[in-house]
Amino acid sequence: MYSGGIGVPAFVKWPKKITPKSTTNFVSSTLDYLPTIVDLLNISFPDDRPVDGVSLLPMIEGRETSRSQPLPFMHKGNAAWIERDLKYIYRDGDIVEIYNLHEDRFEENNLVSQYSEKAKEISNRIMQWNFSCKKSHGGADYSTDFTPVNQWRGIDKLQHK
């Protein structure tokens, strides 16, 4: 959930759209690939199934410098939620850490005491996102003959201390 595990560089080469050797601190994820491809091809999603990512095309074209929606991560019951400069980390269902990624790149200064109310709000949003992922994993967003390939391993309970 920390930057050493989820914060890695990405590379895009597109000579007619991107200035060579340009860089950005835009936060993105593989969740963004599908919406970006759909946007690049100028097509619409076939229905109203939930999509967790955002199109990176506005960033690529220089129209956006920061992410328009939060970026969620989940792994074996742990979660991270990046929204603007803040990163919220939920471990083991009850430990909350908050870091300002712009000012604290190495995630050493835990700001949880300064953002306790915001942490509760984000906790609720993570649980809503987790519920949406769980429903989708169970087939709720697909045809009735869908069978999940493995057991759901998301978050069953998050608490804020």
Segments from the language model and where they lie:
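Long, internal low-complexity/basic segments
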Residues: 33, 101, 106-161
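Hydrophobic, well-ordered secondary-structure elements that form the walls
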Residues: 9, 37, 56, 98-100, ...
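Short strand-connecting beta-turns/loops that link adjacent beta-strands
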Residues: 65, 93-94
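Substrate-binding rim/cap in mid-to-C-terminal beta-strand-loop elements of soluble/periplasmic
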Residues: 1-50, 54-66
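Active-site beta-strand termini and strand-to-loop segments that position acidic
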Residues: 81-84, 90-91
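Short beta-strand-initiation
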Residues: 67, 75-76, 83
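Short Gly/Pro-enriched turn/cap motifs at secondary-structure boundaries
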Residues: 1-3, 71-72, 78
